[in-house]
């Protein structure tokens, strides 16, 4: 299923449009996984103060802490930039794994949205991993 829970996969045009939008709004990163001595792209994340959409496309790699490591890295990036808060605009109600992962990284529910929850991470409330 696409990230938004729609039944039909995105068309190539939709995907191109999505990446153009994301590149304009934030820092777009491709997530890679080392497997058999080679780095393979497995997902992406875009980072800006107002949102952090992340996708790990390979189901066999879900639950291995990859997303958590990416989010922790982006929290450190937010500190470098000087942000005091960062947000996730919406995590869908059905996506309990993402809710748990973001909450484990220090994000807290901020407000109910149409399809889920908006989250905030107040950087002063969580430990700086770079000094640990």
Residue ranges and their predicted role:
Residues 103-113:
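Conserved acetyl-CoA-binding loop of GNAT-fold acetyltransferases
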